[in-house]
Amino acid sequence: LTEIAGPSRPTPYRQIPDSFAGTLARNGLELRRAETTTLQVNVGFLCDQSCRHCHVSAGPGRTEVMSRGTMDAVESFARQGAFAVIDVTGGAPELVPGIEGFLERLAPLAPRLLFRANLTALAARPDLVDLFVRLRVVVIASFPALDADPADAQRAPGVFEASLATLRVLNAAGYGRVGSGLELDLVANPSGTLLPPDQSAEEERFHRELAAVHGITFNRLYTLANVPLGRFRSWLASSGHLEDYLQQLAGSFNPCAVDGLMCRNLVSVAWDGMLYD
């Protein structure tokens, strides 16, 4: 992951948190592979933003995007896998050449096709919204905060308003509306070294405030901690926060979450066609 995310060297720190394996053992838990149900496809690191928290260091200057030949190989693999879910991510998948045809070919191969959308990149692709509706794609969009200041500080000036505009377009197409069958989920991650708040309470707050202030509706909210890799790890190291953040993550271990870890039932294809379990 460090190689994929860009050049960075491990940063020494005074106290290494207990290993994940050690934490599992201390809690009487085992991490075992379950049935593979999900194929995640990372179509590349090209993005229209350069977020400080990005764990793959995506950005406008990245040239790593999935080729048509690799897309064909992924399609062939998906046909053999009988996956319940195909999950397309990036970078900003909206910017990858040929993404429309790729989605068309993947849609019949799994009951659920997920698209992890970049709302500012999607703003320039109304054709993709029409395609999402036709293919019944589940749209999962990053929306970090309910106010412009923290959102723009994390992303870039103007991102908050541009994201709201795209959410309105998705709502107008039926996404996030009761009874439409078109699922729109949001993902919120905190700024800096904060950990996310309780997901249920935060989902209620997002539902309430987005509807009241902006007239926007959605289905689910997922709150995620920032992963200490890539550009975010570099920032943690340069700002002197890496050791404390790792300790904070280790100290916040939730044994109830182990059964739901993505690595138990997911395989991932990178932009260059490498397959990971």
What do the PLM-derived regions correspond to, one by one?
Residues 1, 148-262:
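Radical SAM enzyme [4Fe-4S]-AdoMet core and its adjacent flexible, acidic
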Residues 1-7:
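Intrinsically disordered, low-structural-confidence terminal and linker regions
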Residues 7-90, 94-105:
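Conserved alpha-helical substructure of the radical SAM core
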Residues 38, 58-67, 81-96, 106-124, ...:
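Core AdoMet radical
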Residues 75, 103, 129, 164-167, ...:
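Generic structural signal for well-ordered alpha-helices
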Residues 96-100, 125-126, 199-200:
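Conserved strand-to-helix beginnings and helix N-cap segments that scaffold or border functional pockets
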Residues 269-270:
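Short, acidic, Ser/Thr-enriched surface-loop or helix-capping motifs
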Residues 274-275:
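Hydrophobic "anchor" residues
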